[in-house]
Amino acid sequence: MRLLWKLVILLPLINSCAGESRFTRPIFIQEPQDVIFPLDLSRSEIILSCTASGYPSPHYRWKQNGTDIDFSMTYHYRLDGGSLAISSPRTDQDIGIYQCLATNPVGTILSRKAKLQFAYIEDFETKSRSTVSVREGQGVVLLCGPPPHFGELSYDWTFNDNPLYVQEDKRRFVSQNTGNLYIAKVEPSDVGNYTCFVTNKEAHRSVQGPPTPLVQRTDGVMGEYEPKIEVRFPETIQAAKDSSVKLECFALGNPVPDISWRRLDGSPMPGKVKYSNSQATLEIPKFQQEDEGFYECVAGNLRGRNLAKGQLIFYAPPEWEQKIQNTYLSIYDSLFWECKASGNPNPSYTWLKNGERLNTEERIQTENGTLIITMLNVSDSGIYQCAAENKYQTIYANAELRVLASAPDFSKNPIKKISVVQVGGDISIECKPNAFPKASISWKRGTENLKQSKRVFFLEDGSLKICNVTRSDAGSYTCVATNQFGNGKSSGSLIVKERTVITVPPSKMDVTVGESIVLPCQVSHDPTMEVLFVWYFNGDVIDLKKGVAHFERIGGESVGDLMIRNIQLGHSGKYLCTVQTTLERLSAVADIIVRGPPGPPEDVKVEHISSTTSQLSWRPGPDNNSPIQIFTIQTRTPFSVGWQAVATVPEILNGQTYNATVIGLSPWVEYEFRVVAGNNIGIGEPSKPSELLRTKASIPNVAPVNINGGGGSRSELVITWEPIPEELQNGEGFGYIIMFRPVGSTTWMKEKVALVESSKFIYRNESIMPLSPFEVKVGVYNNEGEGSLSTVSIVYSGEDEPRLAPRGTSVQSFSASDMEVSWNAIAWNRNTGRVLGYEVLYWTDNSKESMIGKIRVSGNVTTKNITGLRANTIYFASVRAYNTAGTGPSSPPVNVTTKKSPPSQPPANIAWKLSNSKLCLNWEHVKTMENESEVLGYKILYRQNRQSKTHVLETNNTSAELLVPFEEDYLIEIRTVSDGGDGSSSEEIRIPKMSSLSSVGVQILKPSTQFLTMVGFFYCFVIQPLSR
């Protein structure tokens, strides 16, 4: 009966909550702030801001000093939106603490406390101030005595009529706490009138006090005395977090005291500390916990020192560490909220509901920032505030508690309409209706109630779980939810699919670099389901869409084979084929081992090096899955072409050998070494080169070759040889040893040539007869000693130039462009000079200054044809003998005139006729110009079309017959013959083979005319000339 009454009471509330589910609580956008209002300001209104969001829009109330403001009773206060406007503010009525309250159907929130104060400063009294008399050297304090005020003040002093304020220094100080002016030691220049100026920043007003006269006494000068501290800071100062703290300390004394500061706990002053010019003010900006402690001011001079000290105590208003959050609970549930705030001193906590203090009772308990409400009912809904307060400030954390009571409802969270599972799989169908309190759940399959079994389970959250699903489990399932407020139900269908199976998985493979392989991945699956294949390599997805090099997916819908083309060492690893459907994810993995040539050996070092050997060590590189079988050592020098393999000890370096001796090196040569490894797959990349090292020096062991010489001047022996390459010089200080003696002599003469690049030595001696034979040997040496000598060669000494000129010189022109020069050979002997050949000189007038050229012939040749001459031109020629010493005297010059130029016009109007194997040709006689040679005859040049060999027929007539087998096309051209040479040729004529002609014809060619003519019984064909 009691439960029934509860339901009767709750039903209206439940209906109301259903309509309010879309309401949102008020949240402050803008809260009132502390205001110090200047009384003298002409503005006649104060605005305390307050704005809140929420749906529906909140309405506002205000409290002053804890009492609601009744806006209906006065026009002095009015609402401007949510803000409070105070017209014609008055100190006696309006000063105090204000709070804004924002309310909508969800609840009420209370704003922070805002303090309203009024800033002012009254005028100084107008009565005169007493004169202050001091001795020179004495300290003095001039009192300001500010008038009644409220708000922060600042102080300045002026001296006499000077508009500038008195500047502070070590001797003078204006306290911003008391406003007094302190002069540590009075000087004669200080005498005069002093005026105090006071400014109230909040009140926007400054006032000026009456002047204070300062006069100097005449009864002597003040002697020295120890400092007397007149400005002290309090013994205890409360300093807020992040505030700027200023401590003042100033002393009178003679001499003027020095001010210094320190911390009594011995810790250094914070780096952020600032000092005034006079050191009388210590400022600590952004005050923090670590800045609190005891501070001491020390004032000292020659007469002594004095101290002032005080304690800075850190305080901080509350700051939230943990706030409460909006909470939605079911009726009869329990609420637990906790809020935490930091602060110094530690804050205390108060709880409010809808702006009013929350009273504790049996269900509602509060303790140290926690709130517990048991057996919640709908009336507990509202806006709650946790207030954290210490003596410096109060802060609020706000949250909504919404207590829900409703019958089960599936409208927002129905059962999934279609659930799909595979045979043998497990399926969970969720049932999560909105129900307050929580509903009891039952299930139906079709129209029958479902019971739990070994495969069917009802989970705690109401879900239905079916294990090891069979095809018979398919069908419609309904979830029925019930609580004391009613019931609800929701249905869905279960569809059972066949399982997916990987029928051909990838398998382990062992492959060689450069091969192409296919990793299979084939499945059987339910035909109604799509299958997605994804391949992974060492855990990373292979993105085939981006066209990754080497990888390609091949196969059809049920085949996900992966082809790897030109496989590389980096492709060794694990390959995972995943098969995904909407219901499951299968995978199969295979290891691929890629074998390749070894990687480069590492850490190649030269342990020792001699003149011809080097000891090397190295570490093997990766074997790339195939054991290393052999190492090879290669060297490179500045003289070699690339890297060369070298001989080693041991001769064969197997895969377990990591050091060897290189032999056969050249002394005094810079070498680099590298090591190459090989295995069954091939030869790998070489190692990095070793450091560049030079073999030790040694005596040169290679003698020069091609020992030769001869020539030169009379009384000279010229010896030549092929220089020794730098890589065979074996050390520094390299040079050549020249040994020679006359044939028949037993004594060798010896000379040294120190130039490395030398390949020639000249020995001079007036006693040497021309063409005297010498035995010659050439050797080598360096700083290590003398090396090998070459074999003996015979070299002749220098000779004289020929002394005789050729006789019987003649010249004859054969054409327009060449001539032939003839002479008689010289019968020479040792006294007349050896003749190695002759030199022909030719020119165009009787002076050799117009020399055109010279041509040499060797041996006993006595004629020379000279070509490339100008036509119809007189040429002169002479001949002289030469040998290794030079040329002899020239023969007397002879001359000849070259022939005129050959005809420039080619034969024209060429006609031909062909009968059997006989070709008849006719053409017009060529007429020459005056400067051209007369036509002596004609040349017919003919060849088969596909052959390059040309046949020539000469005739003095303007016709010719050719007897040739015309089995193929012939190409024919005709040119003139004259004393000046052959003239211009006609255009090339193509004579077609017999089989291509229907009868016999005549071809007639003119530059611009083509015509057809009958000759006897033959046809005439006009054929275009071929392009040359």
Swiss-Prot record:
Domain Ig-like C2-type per the UniProt entry, residue ranges: 32-117, 122-208, 227-308, 318-402, 408-495, 499-587
Organism superkingdom: Eukaryota
Covalently attached lipid (GPI-anchor amidated serine), positions: S999
Record membrane topology: Lipid-anchor; GPI-anchor
Record domain Fibronectin type-III: where: 600-698, 703-800, 805-901, 902-996
Disulfide linkage: C50-C100, C144-C196, C249-C297, C339-C386, C431-C479, C521-C577
CDD domains, A to Z: FN3, Ig5_Contactin
Endpoints of the signal sequence: 1-19
Region span, Disordered: 887-908
Residues listed as glycosylation sites in the UniProt record: N65, N193, N368, N377, N468, N659, N765, N860, N865, N895, N931, N956, N957
Gene Ontology process terms (BP): cell adhesion; Notch signaling pathway; positive regulation of Notch signaling pathway
Keyword Cell membrane in annotation: yes
Entry keyword Ribonucleoprotein: no
Tissue expr: Specifically expressed in neuronal cells. In brain, it is expressed in spinal cord, cerebrum and cerebellum. At 17 dpc, it is expressed in hippocampus, cerebellum, and the brain stem. Strongly expressed after birth with a maximum level between P1 and P21, which corresponds to the time frame of oligodendrogliogenesis.
InterPro entries for the chain: FN3_dom (IPR003961), FN3_sf (IPR036116), Ig-like_dom (IPR007110), Ig-like_dom_sf (IPR036179), Ig-like_fold (IPR013783), Ig_I-set (IPR013098), Ig_sub (IPR003599), Ig_sub2 (IPR003598)
Subcellular location: Cell membrane
A single Gene Ontology CC term: plasma membrane
PROSITE patterns: FN3, IG_LIKE
PANTHER family in the record: CONTACTIN 6, PROTEIN SIDEKICK
Quaternary structure annotation from Swiss-Prot or TrEMBL: Interacts with PTPRG.
Protein name per Swiss-Prot or TrEMBL: Contactin-6
Originating species: Rattus norvegicus (Rat)
UniProt gene name: Cntn6
